[in-house]
């Protein structure tokens, strides 16, 4: 994965229920990890930390926004403000070379993970600018979950 994405292996991490067995997402209420054979299987969530990739992707979206409307603009800008970017397989490519090249790499990697490692879960990822942004995002989610637990007692 590290070689395919050109990101140091220390800057790639599995998170979420695939790592902890339970989801810490406030909206999922500690749901347990479900394998691909189970009904409604869980996703595999991956953190990618690369300031260069974050900056290049942000630049690509700025260039795109100068030419046309970006789908889910408010979500994208909210993510960038929090120093991460999510790109889904189904997202518009906008005829931007950086976005198209990145999605080609990711699609190839996902196919390899399925054939080589028999990982058939949907794979989601976020590109973070740095580890501080990862920490801040996940601490806020855990705090929300903690407050929900306290409120229901």
Indicate where each model-derived feature is located.
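Catalytic core of pol beta-like nucleotidyltransferases
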Residues: 1-42, 49-153
